[in-house]
Every structure is written in structure tokens, then in C-alpha cells.
């Protein structure tokens, strides 16, 4: 290799490290820390069986049409354990140290090779050295280093993975790509050696970990909530008869993006009149008329964590007497739900408290004759866990660190 070619290759290898250093001043710095992800991996490994292995895959790129992809969204579990937001990657977490490709440890990650042509079109690929530098992971390899002989499964007693149905890795077999290739190899080994798949146990472990938020996570959820509230407040100021639902959505999502939110936490719901009674209405096309109410169920996602905020306001800025009565009943129910959020209480307590207020109120108003009839106007639960997923996983007991929503509602067509 001549000197010129060697110099070019050195620049190519050093570039990601220089770029990562520059990002500390040119890009957001409030992502989850490498120490956070390392701590979560250690906590997961602690809960594995004596000789278990956890296997997690990055999300695949999804095609929107022809040669255009959807904006990439990482698997939440993979993100939780690594922070990496690239496709075509696999994480292995072992209870006991093993040796893979002459490296001994309990954590191994396989990632994409750097590719100048792909990077020209879709942006920088971190590669092995970039992942080591950014996420402080030691045992990092390229996908093409993974073969059927890479892992000795003979001593493994259980495989912990969140995937099953038609073979737990079937979702990765649709397209021939590096991720599918690795998944097929792992699946073949597991089937050949009859290793049990602890899918249910995996979900229970993930729920116990992800359900109790760490301080870094709470800060990101609070940021997502603050961004979301800014959007809701501006919609309340801007709404007027003649505005379209999609204009309310545009105002909302403008605030999300201008405050650094990567995505909405879920498709924005902005429904007026009859559309406000469709729980997951996302068409957002109707013109909002005088006297109608607009329900906005919209929230930002910030660095992987979602908020969840719903507000209902009159288009003309003034509640009718009937609208005010129902609004205040829902507010009273929400306050009852908040009061029931006590550490150690069953997860269902806020729902029971809010539902009692709604049912009694609707019967007193003569809208419902009994609880069964009242339920038609309050058809969903009051609370769910909130975090990496807007409907997140978590324990069935209200423990310190649990974040949940309290969102009763009354829907009268």
C-alpha cells in the first residue's frame, strides 16, 4: 500500500473519533450517559438464569415507498441497553463470562461496518471504533465477524429474548440483510440444540427494569412533558372557529421540533365535535366550528422518552354551561386519581378512584342510569406506564420511580 492510500485510510478511521469529539459542542449533550446504559445491562444480567444469555436486536429500516425509508426508530429495548440508534446490530448479554473472537466478557455487540457510499446518502455510521468511543463498550465487532461458530451455546441453559411466535427471530427474516443473517444463525443454533426460550421471563425482567425510572430517565420525560405543554398552551391561545384540526396539530408539532423533540410520542390526535369521541382519531381534517370542543391528545418524544398530554378546550374560548359541568367533573376525577397515587398501592387504584367520581357524577346528572351505562362514556383505563413507550411496561404496584398517567375522560357523542 502506498503512502497516499495509507494516509487516506488513516483519515477514514480517525474521522469518526474526531467527529464524536466535535459533537460534544455542536449537538445536544443531554442524552442518556454510557454509564446509564452500562448499569441497565448489568441489572439485566443480574436477573438472568445461572448460564443464561440475553439477545437483543436493533430495529430494521422500514421501507415507506420504493427507495424511500421511514424515519428510523430504534428498538426501545435495544436503545435502553446501548443508546445506539443504528440498524443492523445485535447485543449479547451473558450471565457468566464467555470468550468470543478472542475477547472474554459478559457483553458483546455486533454493529455495521463503516461504508463511505452508504454514509454519503444516509449519514455517518459509527462502526466499531465509533461505538467504542461513544458508548464505552469494549467488546465490539462487525456483523460479518459473526458466524455459526462465534458462540458456544453448549453451556447456555436459557435464551432470554423478547421475541417469539413462528420462531422468536422471525420478524428479522423478511429481508436478507446483516441483521437477518445473524438472526437466522442464532435461531438455527437454538433450534438445533433445543435451547429453551425464556420469552415470558424476559418480558418480566424488562418490565421490572424499565418500569422503575432512573433519575436520567425522569429528566428526559420531564423535558418531553415541558415541550408538550408548551405546544398545548399555544394551541389554546390560537384556537378559533374556522381553524382546521390539522392546523392545531401543526402548531403543536412546531413546538415539538423547535424544542429538539425527534418525533411525536405517538400520532397526534386533534379531534373536534364528533371526532373528539374517537379515542385514537388521527385524520385531523375537520374544520372546527363555533361552539365545538377540540380534544388534543399530543405529546413530544425527547431522546427516546415520551410524554402523554390530553386537553380539551372550546373553539371560541368560552365553555357553555353543559361543557363546563362535564369538564369540571373530569377534572375532579383526575384529582381523585392523583390522590390515589400512593407508593405501595395497586396500579389500578387511580383508575378505581377516578372511575368512581365519573360514574357517580354521570348518574347524578341523569346522563347514565347506572354504572354499566356510565361506562359507555368512559370506555378506557385511567392510567398506564409512561417512558420509552407511551404505553410503557412496568410493575402492577405503584413503587418509587414508577411514572404513570392519570387521564380520565368523558365522551358524549
Predicted regions and their residues:
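Bacterial Sec-dependent N-terminal signal peptides
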Residues: 1-23
